[in-house]
Design a protein with these regions (language model features):
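Conserved catalytic segments around the Walker B and adjacent sensor/switch elements
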Residues: 67-77
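Phosphate-binding P-loop
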Residues: 36-43, 111
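Mid-core helix/loop region of P-loop NTP-binding domains shared across ATPases and GTPases
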Residues: 2-11, 80-87, 94-144, 180-188, ...
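Walker A/P-loop nucleotide-binding motif
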Residues: 40-62, 76
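Residue-level preference for the first positions of well-ordered beta-strands
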Residues: 45-47, 69-70, 115-117, 144
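A short helix-turn-beta junction within AAA+ P-loop NTPase domains corresponding to the substrate/partner-engaging
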Residues: 68-70, 160-179
């Protein structure tokens, strides 16, 4: 791809890697840390929801990285209640070849003894019975539990009827996250490269409100600029955005 030079200049970029950039505190990460602390200290059931790509998982892992009493489980579409219990037991060092009842009792005792806070990420994949089991774990252990996922997680809990209608009322604290702010985007861009105001603005315009897309876009733009042996320009950023699967 041949790119003509424009006036936005960059003195140099940092080495390109496929790992995440250094953690940058954002408005959403501050909210996540605050909710996590309240859930941990007050032993509540909490919920955090937000669209994909805004840094939920990254912030949760950063929070847990600094503590020994946090267990994060990432749910997926295979997470039946049994799979969830086995996954928690595996992380707690509990034998998983036992009956479901014995595994449940084992994790209850281990969590109480260790005073573990449990975080379930991508919790929109959990069936309602799985969420009810988390409620039961909370009742039995007195430990804080946080579920985090896409906006439909909260909508699904609010719409529960019949035997599960009470679950939503058990949530003691929560937050709905917004798209990253312009300040957040600028800080992330500048953690990855030397960038002036106009360059940051261009990345903000093309990031579609997603930190995940933003990080990919910055890396792609730097690579394209290096291939063409020129600074990152608005045109390069726009062309690089077209190459991303948005």
């Amino acid at each position: 791809m041949k790119i003509k030079d424009e006036s936005i200049k960059m003195s140099r970029s940092k080495p390109i890697t496929d790992t995440d950039p250094d953690f940058i505190e954002t408005k959403n990460s501050k909210t996540i840390f605050e909710i996590c602390e309240m859930v941990r200290i007050e032993k509540e059931i909490g919920i955090i929801t937000g669209r994909a790509g805004i840094g939920k998982t990254y912030s949760l892992k950063e929070y847990a990285r600094h503590r020994q009493d946090i267990l994060i489980i990432e749910a997926d579409i295979t997470f039946t209640p049994k799979v969830m219990i086995k996954e928690i037991c595996t992380h707690l060092g509990i034998i998983t070849g036992l009956s479901l009842h014995d595994m449940f009792e084992g994790l209850v005792e281990k969590m109480k003894t260790m005073d573990i806070m449990l975080i379930i990420d991508e919790a929109e994949h959990l069936p309602v019975r799985g969420i009810d089991i988390l409620r039961r774990i909370h009742d039995r252990t007195g430990c804080g539990i946080l579920i985090c996922g896409l906006p439909q997680l909260l909508m699904r809990l609010k719409s529960l009827r019949g035997d599960y209608a009470y679950i939503f009322s058990r949530i003691g604290i929560g937050a709905r996250l917004d798209a990253p702010t312009k300040k957040d985007v600028y800080a992330i861009v500048r953690s990855m490269m030397d960038a002036d105001e106009k360059t940051c603005e261009s990345f903000y315009e093309h990031s579609a409100g997603s930190i995940r897309i933003l990080v990919k876009l910055v890396r792609r733009s730097i690579r394209v600029a290096q291939i063409n042996q020129m600074p990152v320009t608005r045109e390069i950023i726009a062309e690089s955005a077209k190459l991303l699967t948005l």
